[in-house]
């Protein structure tokens, strides 16, 4: 069973769906693409092998989890991998079509060995 963060969590997770709806309603977008999870090889270009494994295996220490701000549960790990995959996909689409964005992107607080501010990768 996929563990999820609760609806009572202070991070506004629904904002990503709302952004997509707004772009559709305003006729800003023509296409949406479904990203796949970012590969270990790609993640390892920006993050340490140890940190990636601690996230994937959910073995990050309590202080690291606290810095991120999310519980380290299956849904957070999957969402983080897919959101990062979305940024990779958006960059490829932008190179092909001139413009693209990741509506679940924008998290930019993680560094090589740790996450922070609701940003895992």
Name these PLM-found stretches.
Residues 1-121:
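HDAC/HDAC-like amidohydrolase catalytic core signature
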């Amino acid at each position: 069973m996929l563990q999820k963060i609760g609806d009572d969590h202070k991070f506004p997770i629904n904002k990503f769906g709302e952004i997509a709806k707004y772009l559709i309603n305003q006729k800003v977008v023509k296409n949406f693409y479904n990203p796949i999870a970012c590969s270990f090889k790609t993640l390892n270009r920006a993050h340490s092998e140890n940190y990636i494994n601690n996230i994937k295996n959910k073995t990050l220490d309590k202080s690291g989890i606290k810095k991120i701000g999310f519980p380290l549960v299956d849904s957070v790990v999957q969402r983080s991998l897919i959101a990062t995959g979305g940024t990779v996909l958006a960059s490829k689409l932008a190179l092909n079509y001139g413009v693209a964005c990741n509506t679940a992107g924008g998290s930019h607080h993680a560094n090589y060995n740790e996450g922070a501010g609701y940003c895992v990768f």
